[in-house]
Amino acid sequence: MIINPTTSDPEVSALEKKNTGRIAQIIGPVLDVTFPPGKMPNIYNALIVKGRDTVGQQINVTCEVQQLLGNNRVRAVAMSATDGLTRGMEVIDTGAALSVPVGGVTLGRIFNVLGEPIDNLGPVDTRTTSPIHRSAPAFIQLDTKLSIFETGIKVVDLLAPYRRGGKIGLFGGAGVGKTVLIMELINNIAKAHGGVSVFGGVGERTREGNDLYMEMKESGVINEKNIAESKVALVYGQMNEPPGARMRVGLTALTMAEYFRDVNEQDVLLFIDNIFRFVQAGSEVSALLGRMPSAVGYQPTLSTEMGSLQERITSTKEGSITSIQAVYVPADDLTDPAPATTFAHLDATTVLSRGLAAKGIYPAVDPLDSTSTMLQPRIVGEEHYETAQRVKQTLQRYKELQDIIAILGLDELSEEDRLTVARARKIERFLSQPFFVAEVFTGSPGKYVGLAETIRGFKLILSGELDSLPEQAFYLVGNIDEATVKATNLEKESKLKK
C-alpha cells in the first residue's frame, strides 16, 4: 500500500514549483489544458485550477487527466462544478494522482471525493494520505481460504452466507429496510470482528445521505461525544455533483478501506450505494471524452472500469474487505449491461422483499430469492447445508400451497401439508430478529446470533420438537431458547387473562 506521509493540502507552496498550463477549452465538466512542450502531466494526475471568477469569487477546482491529445494538450475531467472558469486560466499540475486522508482520523467523518471533510466538524489530519489509483493486490498476497463472514443475522448466515472478502449485491426498493440492515452490519462487524466500515454514497440523493448520517448518530454507530470511537467513515459523491466526482468517489471510499485492511490489518465492510451510479457516471464521462458508445449507450470500457474497482475488494493475508453493494436495476431489466456486469463479480445476493416487510418480518430478506456461492457442503459443512436446504424446501412448499389456502382454507389440506404450513410459518417468524440499531425505535434489545445457534434453532423447528409452541413465540427473538421462554410467558399471560 502506497502511503504518502505528506500533506494533501493544495494550498502548500510546493504547488507553486510545479509546471503550469492554461485552459484552452471548457466543455461542461471537461477541460482541455495546454502545457509547455516536454512538461505534459501523466494520465490520472490531479490538476488544480486557481483564480477568481468575473465577480471576484475564489475558484479552486481539482481535475483529473484522462487523455493526452497531442499538440501539448491534455483533456481532464473536473471533480467539482466548473462555473466561473474561463479560457486562459492557470492550471497547476500536482505531479501525482488524487490522494485522500486515511486511517483512524476518517472514522465518524463525512468526506467528498477529494478527501475533504464536508461535515463542518473542522479539518482532518492529512499527514497520512494515499492515492486513489492503485493496482489490485498480487495473487501471492491473496488469502485463498474460503471462509464465511459471520454477520450474526440469522437469515443471512443460514441461507445466503457472506464470504469473507467477498462481494454481496443488496437488492430492494424504498422503505424495505436497506438502511437499517446496513447499519446493523456496521454495528456487528465492529462488535464481533473488531472491524470498521466505510460507506461510499455514489450518486444517490443528498437527503438519503443526510438521513443515514442522522440515523447513525442516533443509533450510536457514529459517536458524537467521542468521534474516534465511531465505527464508520462516510464518503459522499451525490447525484447533484459532476460525473467526475461520482465516478471517483467509489475509489476514494475503497482507498480508505484498503488502509484499514493493509496497514491496520482489520476486517473491513465497504458499502457502495449505488454501484449502478458508478457505471452511469462512467458512461457520462466516456461520452464527454468523445468515446464511441457501446451496447445500450454504455461506455466501451464498462467491464474494465468495473473490474478495476471490484478486483481491489478482496481478502489478503493481512485482513479483508467485504463489500456490500446496493444494485439498482434500470427498468427491472437484469440483462441491462450495468447490472449484468455487476453480477459477474458478486458472491452472494441479499434480496429484500416488500411482502415480508408488509407482514412486519424484519429483516425483510427474501429467503428464497437470496443466493450465495458459499452455500456448498464442502465450504459450510453438511449440517449447515442440509438445514438450509430443508428450510428452503419447507418455505417453497408453503409458497406453493398459499393459493390453495386462499381459495379453500387450511382445513382442505392434507395432514402432512398442514404440518408443513405450521412449520413454515414458524420458520418465517424465526427468520426475523431484533436489531441493535433499531432498539431506539422498537424498544426490543438487539440480538447477535452465532451460526451454530442459528443452525440448532432451525433444526429443532424442522424436527418437529417445537410443533406445540405458538408461532408468535418465534417472532423477533434471538436464538431458539428465547422462543421457548417467550412461549412459556405467552402461556402464562393467556392463563392470567382467563
Curated annotation (Swiss-Prot):
Q: Where does ATP bind?
A: 172-179
Q: What class of enzyme is it?
A: translocase
Subunit text: F-type ATPases have 2 components, CF(1) - the catalytic core - and CF(0) - the membrane proton channel. CF(1) has five subunits: alpha(3), beta(3), gamma(1), delta(1), epsilon(1). CF(0) has four main subunits: a(1), b(1), b'(1) and c(9-12).
Per the record, what are the reactions this protein catalyses?
Answer: ATP + H2O + 4 H(+)(in) = ADP + phosphate + 5 H(+)(out)
Alphabetically list the UniProt keywords. ATP synthesis, ATP-binding, CF(1), Chloroplast, Hydrogen ion transport, Ion transport, Membrane, Nucleotide-binding, Plastid, Thylakoid, Translocase, Transport
What is stated as this protein's family in its record?
Answer: Belongs to the ATPase alpha/beta chains family.
The role this protein plays is: Produces ATP from ADP in the presence of a proton gradient across the membrane. The catalytic sites are hosted primarily by the beta subunits.
Report the principal subcellular site. plastid
One of its GO biological process terms is: proton motive force-driven mitochondrial ATP synthesis
UniProt cross-references to PROSITE patterns, sorted A to Z: ATPASE_ALPHA_BETA
Q: Does the keyword Nucleus apply?
A: no
Specify the protein's topology with respect to the membrane.
Peripheral membrane protein
- Provide the protein name: ATP synthase subunit beta, chloroplastic
List the CDD domains hit by this protein, alphabetically. Answer: ATP-synt_F1_beta_C, ATP-synt_F1_beta_N, F1-ATPase_beta_CD
GO terms under cellular component: chloroplast thylakoid membrane; mitochondrion; proton-transporting ATP synthase complex
- Give the GO molecular function terms: ATP binding; ATP hydrolysis activity; proton-transporting ATP synthase activity, rotational mechanism
InterPro entries, alphabetized? AAA+_ATPase, ATP-synt_VA_C, ATP_synth_F1_bsu, ATPase_a/bsu_AS, ATPase_alpha/beta_chains, ATPase_F1/V1/A1_a/bsu_N, ATPase_F1/V1/A1_a/bsu_N_sf, ATPase_F1/V1/A1_a/bsu_nucl-bd
**What compartments host this protein?**
Plastid, Chloroplast thylakoid membrane
Offer one Pfam family short name for this entry. ATP-synt_VA_C
The record, for SUPFAM superfamilies, names: C-terminal domain of alpha and beta subunits of F1 ATP synthase (SSF47917), N-terminal domain of alpha and beta subunits of F1 ATP synthase (SSF50615), P-loop containing nucleoside triphosphate hydrolases (SSF52540)
Q: Which organism is it from?
A: Lotus japonicus
